[in-house]
Design a protein with these regions (language model features):
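Intrinsically disordered, low-complexity segments enriched in small residues
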Residues: 3-117, 121-281
Length: 281
């Protein structure tokens, strides 16, 4: 169903359109999408620029929302639990490694604060749709997925997707929305069955693998978040030239760094020796 409340308005076609806010001038709109699955409602909020300067995206922004929103003592898998998806400040920029986003909630595995990062196309696509973060609360009565296509936001039925493997789910959502470039962040059977270490995946190759964020998403009967955006990061930057130069400089540094090949060929396991030497394993 269309997700149209508060600052949203309804088009003649019946879908929800949420107004765009002006960009901040440094590649961020400051727009936050809030979704209440119990009431099947959503609205946008404009983040104060002073707050965004203190918590400029990613882990910092996710932590800010968790501190503000989460009620101590709330069970990680209850409808009142808060799930935050937050982009980094540079996510979507033409800069090496700028494709990261963070998912945060109370961890069902540890009971403590949990967060997990991932790369891939989902984060940049969320930025292109005009959002810095998504805050999800409540629990849908039946399986659903969230569709975000620029200003059009819908909560759609996912009954036919529940129990299916990620490859099938991604293909089915793209077919339903008629767009093969829709980026899908989703849970698998582990998240559906509330396995406390369940992960999230986007593009079938990038994973939020830590702290059981898949179980939190599954507890909300939220199968997936599908995003498609038409804007681009550079359009919201006051002075694009330094960003482009930063991108070139970082690309050279990353290419020449001794860890680059290990990370490219081995993924996160390429950091085992480094983390062990630092006493972080």
């Amino acid at each position: 169903q269309p997700c149209a409340k508060h600052s949203a308005w309804r088009t003649s076609a019946g879908s929800a359109r949420i107004p765009r806010e002006r960009p901040t001038g440094y590649g961020a709109t400051g727009r936050i999408l809030r979704v209440d699955l119990t009431r099947m409602r959503c609205h946008t909020e404009q983040l104060d620029e002073d707050v965004y300067r203190l918590y400029p995206g990613g882990k910092a922004l996710a932590g800010y929302f968790m501190l503000r929103e989460f009620v101590p003592g709330t069970d990680a898998l209850s409808p009142d639990s808060v799930l935050v998806v937050a982009n980094g400040l540079l996510t979507g920029a033409p800069v090496s490694t700028a494709a990261r986003f963070t998912v945060a909630a109370r961890s069902p595995l540890t009971g403590a604060y949990g967060e997990s990062e991932a790369g891939g196309y989902f984060g940049p696509e969320l930025k292109a749709a005009g959002y810095e973060a998504i805050i999800v609360t409540g629990r849908a009565a039946a399986p659903v997925y969230l569709s975000i296509r620029d200003a059009n936001v819908e909560i759609r039925d996912a009954g036919g997707l529940w129990g299916r493997e990620p490859e099938e789910v991604q293909a089915a959502i793209r077919a339903e929305l008629g767009d093969s470039y829709v980026r899908v962040l989703q849970i698998g059977p582990g998240g559906e069955n509330l396995v406390r270490y369940a992960a999230l995946t986007n593009e079938l190759a990038h994973f939020n693998g830590r702290t059981g964020m898949g179980a939190v998403m599954g507890s909300k009967n939220l199968k997936a978040i599908a995003v498609r955006g038409k804007s681009r990061y550079i359009q919201g930057v006051s002075d694009a030239a330094p960003v482009a130069e930063l991108g070139k400089s970082l690309a050279r540094r990353v290419k020449d760094h001794p860890l680059a090949w290990d990370l490219q060929s081995k993924g996160t396991t390429g950091l085992v020796d480094v983390l062990n030497a630092a006493g972080m394993l």
